[in-house]
Regions:
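C-terminal end-helix/capping segment
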Residues: 104-125
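GST superfamily/GST-like fold recognition
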Residues: 74-98, 116
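Alpha-helical transition-metal enzyme core signature, strongest for iron centers
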Residues: 21-28, 55-58, 93
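Surface-exposed helix-capping loop/turn segments at secondary-structure junctions
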Residues: 2, 67-77, 120-126
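Short helix-capping/linker segments at secondary-structure and domain boundaries
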Residues: 29, 40-43, 93-102
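All-alpha amphipathic helical-bundle segments outside canonical DNA-binding/catalytic cores
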Residues: 8-16, 71-82
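Amphipathic alpha-helical packing segments from all-alpha helical-bundle domains
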Residues: 50-68
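GST-like domain detector, emphasizing the conserved glutathione-binding G-site
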Residues: 1-48
Length: 138
């Protein structure tokens, strides 16, 4: 019911969660773009300025989100869709580019993601495949 909704139905709370989701989705889009470029295109034709710009956008996005926490969760005292989405995206980034993600220094995101990953719903959906080799993406 509404008391368990992950996105408030209206008002400032809804706008806050939607804003956090938008930044998380935009950040993840850049993570996927860089991974795609580095995984599927020959290294000699990578467009390095574009990759560097994407990495900067990923860094800025995650750091902005890390600074956006308003308590235990991103939007305050209750877990929202923004928290779940960010935890999943953080896990994907760590699986595909662990060295890059470690250098970001986003301790609040890492802590929140770690807490969520320990819950039964997250444990039930753990990936079975091995992560991509990090040397392919660094």
């Amino acid at each position: 019911g509404p008391d368990q909704a992950l996105v408030p139905p209206s008002g400032d709370g809804r706008r806050k969660v939607m804003r956090l989701l938008a930044v998380a989705l935009g950040t993840m889009d850049k993570v996927v773009a860089v991974n795609y470029e580095r995984r599927f295109r020959p290294k000699e034709i990578w467009h390095r300025p574009w990759l560097e710009q994407c990495d900067k956008q990923v860094t800025d996005g995650y750091r902005w989100l890390d600074n956006a926490f308003e308590g235990e969760w991103l939007a305050g005292t209750n877990m929202t869709q923004a928290d779940i989405t960010l935890a999943v995206f953080w896990d994907f980034g760590r699986a595909t580019r662990p060295n890059f993600m470690d250098r970001l220094g986003c301790g609040r995101i890492a802590e929140m993601a770690h807490l969520l990953e320990a819950t039964a719903p997250f444990q039930a959906t753990q990936r079975e495949a091995e992560p991509l080799p990090s040397n392919a993406l660094e």
